């Protein structure tokens, strides 16, 4: 059985970890970095760039460079959060046929799952390069406050990337695993995980207990906001830069897509710098131009100003924290440790707010960028059977229920219920001889069903004719360990289990997933072909170069026919290298190798003659006595 890797699929950055010899290790990507920007670029020649290469070209290709796509996962186009992003993103967010939010690049319409799959493929490849074996299974993390649609979308992204997603786990829970596993003390402790990432905010209260030699991680409560993160902090800085520049220069940069991409990069850099400095300079020469010529941007941003710009965002994290504490049935005094997760928690003002909420300094011994991936890898080792001393008890973040008379949300499974869990409820008909019932399933905390997230409509058909209220229809809600809902129904009067039809109101159909899997496989095959072509070209190029050099130095000692044959083979190979036919390049490389065999022999003979040429010379690698210098040495004691 191969390794089950752990992947933190982040809004801004992603990370992959594996467990080796019982210890988790974060794997560096091909660029040598431990985290990979969650950025995907679709370039003109059809190539797809992922991570740092995509980020580097984003300024010149903003409309086809997709970032923060996690914010669109499992969302409808009409969602207020999506509508807000449409005005901010340089790329096109469009409405799919099923009403979902999709993106468009190079005239191709794509689901967020497809785009996320490109990041997952890079994470998969990173792990494979390190392990030296194929990876097919993974544990992928999601924000604790992700709903059913968003979790299902993440699983689908994994499938498109060629991964069997063994488990979806919540990011704060994964961070708690990373934090608590190496703690040797036997004392039970309650921890709060404050996770402010690139696009989402989560808080979980978790109890770590030692039960019969086993570490038990039990989530007591969770809360959050799936549309609050570092990207929003960046946007506040961008809005401020645009307003300041308009005041100074009278030019509105918000209409300039190329300028906006530069502003985004500058805002992110300024925010990071202000975590350690009190002031930073935002300097963008030639940011735009008008009739009067080019315009340059030069602004000073202080830490105090930044804090005033984002104060409202930081304050928004307090509500979910207080709710989570209340739902967990604990007081702030009961919480032993506060752990910070997510890059945005490096901001001093965020750390001050955490201290204010929980009444204690947050711990700094957890890497906020890597802890989630490490925890996912640990859970992977538990699922593969490599670790048997860890038990994870997670919860469902939002209540599940159905719409009943008057449009009321009747909760069947309340939020913060430990999963997996199952709940059954008996329903009946509202009219005589009613042949079918439609059960609308919702997820959320609002009293009226319509204000919550509609997960789907469950139709039960073929009910035997009877008076209203007589048929007994048992509906069972079953949440698996991934936090994903499954529904079954049974007509209790007949004892038959009737198959329920789930009319998913969003998400990808099985056909769409299969098509995207095939597309991804085709891309992988294309990538392999491209790599093979580059390798063949490099081999051919190296042979052509060395042959030309040898011909210049030793060509005079060849027969005229031999020299002509080599020159003809060189010409053929040069032509083949310009093309894209790998077979032709390989054939011509082989032909040149054969044609230049005699030349190779001449070169070898010349080298050997040169090596033995110097009479009375010292043998290679030895020195004559004349070169040796006698020296006295004295030992020096550094400690004096």
UniProtKB/Swiss-Prot annotation:
Domain of life per record: Bacteria
Modified-residue entries (Phosphothreonine), positions: 200
UniProt keywords, alphabetically: ATP-binding, Chaperone, Nucleotide-binding, Phosphoprotein, Stress response
CDD domains assigned to the protein according to its UniProt record, in alphabetical order: ASKHA_NBD_HSP70_DnaK-like
SUPFAM superfamilies the UniProt entry points to: Actin-like ATPase domain, Heat shock protein 70kD (HSP70), C-terminal subdomain, Heat shock protein 70kD (HSP70), peptide-binding domain
GO molecular function terms listed in the Swiss-Prot or TrEMBL record: ATP binding; ATP-dependent protein folding chaperone; unfolded protein binding
PROSITE patterns on file: HSP70_1, HSP70_2, HSP70_3
Region listing for Disordered, in residue ranges: 608-628
Stored InterPro entries: ATPase_NBD, Chaperone_DnaK, Heat_shock_70_CS, HSP70_C_sf, HSP70_peptide-bd_sf, Hsp_70_fam
Induction info: By stress conditions e.g. heat shock.
Protein function: Acts as a chaperone.
Family label: Belongs to the heat shock protein 70 family.
Classification via PANTHER family: HEAT SHOCK PROTEIN 70KDA
Protein's recorded name: Chaperone protein DnaK
Lineage: Bacteria, Pseudomonadati, Pseudomonadota, Betaproteobacteria, Burkholderiales
Primary gene name: dnaK
């Amino acid at each position: 059985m191969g390794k089950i890797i752990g992947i933190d699929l982040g809004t801004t950055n992603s990370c992959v970890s594996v467990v080796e010899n019982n210890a988790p290790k974060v794997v560096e990507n091909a660029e040598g970095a431990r985290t990979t920007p969650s950025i995907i670029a679709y370039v003109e020649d059809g190539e797809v760039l992922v991570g740092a290469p995509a980020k580097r070209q984003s300024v010149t290709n903003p409309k086809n460079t997709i970032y923060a796509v996690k914010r669109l996962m499992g969302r409808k186009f009409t969602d207020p959060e999506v509508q807000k992003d449409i005005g901010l993103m340089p790329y096109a967010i469009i409405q799919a046929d099923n009403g979902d939010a999709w993106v468009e690049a190079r005239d191709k319409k794509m689901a967020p799952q497809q785009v996320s799959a490109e990041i997952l493929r890079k994470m998969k490849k990173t792990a494979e390069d390190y392990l030296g074996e194929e990876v097919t299974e993974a544990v992928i993390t999601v924000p604790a406050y992700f709903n059913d649609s968003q979790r299902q979308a993440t699983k689908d992204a994994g499938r498109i990337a060629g991964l069997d997603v063994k488990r979806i786990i919540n990011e704060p829970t994964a961070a708690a695993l990373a934090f608590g596993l190496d703690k040797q003390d036997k004392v039970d402790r309650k921890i709060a995980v404050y996770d402010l990432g690139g696009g989402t905010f989560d808080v979980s209260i978790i109890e770590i207990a030692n039960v019969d030699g086993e570490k038990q991680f039990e989530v007591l409560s969770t809360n959050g906001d799936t549309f609050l993160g570092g990207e929003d902090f960046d946007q506040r800085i961008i809005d401020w830069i645009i307003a300041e520049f308009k005041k100074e220069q009278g030019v509105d940069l918000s209409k300039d897509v190329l300028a906006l991409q530069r502003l985004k990069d500058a805002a992110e850099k300024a925010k990071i710098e202000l975590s350690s400095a009190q002031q930073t300079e935002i300097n963008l020469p030639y940011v735009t131009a008008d009739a009067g010529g080019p315009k340059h941007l030069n602004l000073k941003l202080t830490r105090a100003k930044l804090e005033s710009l984002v104060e409202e965002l930081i304050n928004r994290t307090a509500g979910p924290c207080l709710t989570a504490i209340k739902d967990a049935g604990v007081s702030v005094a009961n919480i032993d440790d506060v752990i910070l997760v997510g890059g945005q928690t490096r901001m001093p003002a965020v750390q001050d707010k955490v201290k204010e909420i929980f009444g204690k300094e947050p711990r700094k011994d957890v890497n906020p960028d890597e802890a989630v991936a490490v925890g996912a890898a640990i859970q992977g080792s538990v699922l593969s059977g490599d670790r048997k001393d860890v038990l994870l008890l997670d919860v469902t973040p939002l209540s599940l229920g159905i719409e009943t008379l008057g449009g009321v949300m009747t909760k069947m499974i309340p939020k913060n219920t430990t999963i997996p869990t199952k709940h059954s409820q008996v329903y009946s008909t509202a009219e005589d001889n009613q042949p079918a019932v439609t059960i609308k399933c919702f997820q959320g905390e609002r009293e009226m069903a319509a204000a919550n997230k509609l997960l789907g409509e469950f139709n039960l058909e073929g009910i035997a004719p009877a008076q209203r209220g007589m048929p007994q229809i048992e509906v069972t809600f079953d949440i698996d360990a991934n936090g994903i809902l499954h529904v079954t129904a049974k007509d209790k009067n007949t004892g038959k289990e009737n198959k329920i039809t789930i009319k998913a109101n969003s998400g990808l159909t099985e056909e769409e997933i299969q098509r995207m899997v095939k597309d991804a496989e085709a891309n992988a095959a294309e990538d392999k072909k491209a790599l093979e072509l580059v390798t063949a070209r490099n081999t051919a190029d190296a042979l052509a170069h060395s042959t030309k050099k040898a011909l210049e130095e030793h060509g005079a000692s060849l027969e005229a026919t031999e020299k002509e044959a080599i020159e003809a083979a060189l010409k053929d190979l040069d032509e083949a290298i310009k093309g894209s036919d790998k077979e032709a390049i390989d054939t011509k490389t082989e032909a040149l190798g054969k044609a230049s065999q005699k030349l190779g022999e001449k070169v070898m003979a010349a080298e050997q003659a040169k090596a033995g040429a110097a009479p009375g010379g010292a043998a290679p690698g030895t020195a004559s006595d004349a070169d040796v210098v006698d020296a006295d040495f004295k030992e020096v004691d550094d400690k004096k």
